[in-house]
Amino acid sequence: MKTPFSKMNGLGNKIIVADLRKAIHNITPQAIQALASNPQTHFDQIMAIHPPTQDADFRIEIWNADGSMAKACGNGTRCVIEWLANHNLGNNFRLETSTGIVEGKRQTDGLISVDMGRPYLNAKDMPVSREIIDTNHVDITAGPLQDACLVSVGNLHAIFFIESNIQNIPLEKYGPKLEHDPLFPERCNISIAQITSKKSLTLRTWERGAGLTQACGSAACASAVAAYRRGLTERHIDVNLPKGILSILYRDDEHIIMTGPTEHEFSGLFNPLTGTYKKDHL
């Protein structure tokens, strides 16, 4: 009944990697609530590793702290790759997700790189409630936030570009309102971005199902695409987050490559039915 897990983070994005390859039961809502409410195990996302069903090495399920499922989590995917590499399962991986195959690797410098695939830029490929002709400029407003750019990288993101210091914007006030806007029947990730040069921007994110987060890898990818679409940056930029930097390359073939560090906090065993756990002794 006990399942191996590791508490990790990607630039402060709190991740639990759970090894369910041999588990009899999947994670229950009770277990998710118990882990999310415990200060030691509180997380933004659970990355559950399962045997694959397609041409992949492993299948990944992603759970938010509120019990909802996510379709993509860039930092969580990087943590999974680090976990797999640390368990001597290789350095290059193909991971099956609900939106397709994601490829990633641990580089020789120790950083983790993930190919997030191509973004969806057409409104017909996005869960929105009304017709949108130009997703590069969408009329949605909350306080000083207006003129959003919508980008989907498996999950939907609304990016608002701000000329002033984004630290002065109360995202905890506007994020929930925009996340639940009627335009987004499946809710939305909300980010504010400040361009600092042609090669960098600063980002803060209100994450769907998790709230204000220190880092969101898919938001970093979406913001880089949005900035390039508007002619604000080059294809290869640094995205500055509260806890560090993610390197984002929006290639000519439109694949998004995200590279950055991960951190292991502790490992242990947990019960996927109840969420009770025990740390490993070092």
Curated annotation (Swiss-Prot):
Gene3D superfamilies noted in UniProt: Diaminopimelate Epimerase, Chain A, domain 1
InterPro entries per UniProt: DAP_epimerase_AS, DAP_epimerase_DapF
Membrane-traversing stretches: none
SUPFAM superfamilies xrefs: Diaminopimelate epimerase-like
Pfam families tied to this protein: DAP_epimerase
Subunit structure, interactors included: Homodimer.
Similarity-based family: Belongs to the diaminopimelate epimerase family.
Protein name: Diaminopimelate epimerase
Organism of provenance: Bartonella bacilliformis (strain ATCC 35685 / KC583 / Herrer 020/F12,63)
The encoding gene: dapF
